[in-house]
Amino acid sequence: MNTLPDECVQSLIAFASVSLEGKSQRSISNLCKFRCGLFDGKKRYHLFRETAFLNLFVIHAVCRTMNVPSEKINAAFNYIYRLKFQGKENMNTWFSDLLKRIDAYVETGTEKETGGGFAIAGLFLLNLKSFDKTLPGFEQISVAEYVSKLFAVLTQTMEKYR
């Protein structure tokens, strides 16, 4: 199996850890230039640095609060990676299609597969794209409102699937 998702997860974990250590946003933004082919600068896969920082900070905080093992997050990211980055998606319906796939997977998966880490990985990618104005189907909201909503949703999801 391609090790790319595992490499990405390690980069994400390192990125979140630095953010929690109080580094400057410039330093954090520089870390967002992951040494990972997924983030290759193509418009479709572009990560906004500020958005990545906010997502990772909130996700990492929720994981620590809920005692989610990194193995669950890693397995979840691998699954989401296979769903999203196969290059066959209709970008006009990508958001709703992925939500349906995640719902179906959670309904049919085992307890281990549907752990909180899966929900975190899915929400990370879905919410990250909400800041990308080049993709259809997303509303723009303020950063403060976004962080508040993301933290609430992640916490609720963790309680449901852990």
Tell where the protein language model's regions lie, with residue ranges.
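Short, solvent-exposed secondary-structure capping/transition elements
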Residues: 60-75, 86-90
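Residues within HEAT/ARM-like alpha-solenoid scaffolds
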Residues: 46-50, 72-75, 89-97
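Eukaryote-specific, cytoplasm-facing alpha-helical/coiled-coil scaffolding segments in long proteins
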Residues: 38-42, 76-89
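Extended, well-ordered alpha-helical scaffold segments
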Residues: 8-13, 72-84
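Helix-driven interaction modules
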Residues: 83-162
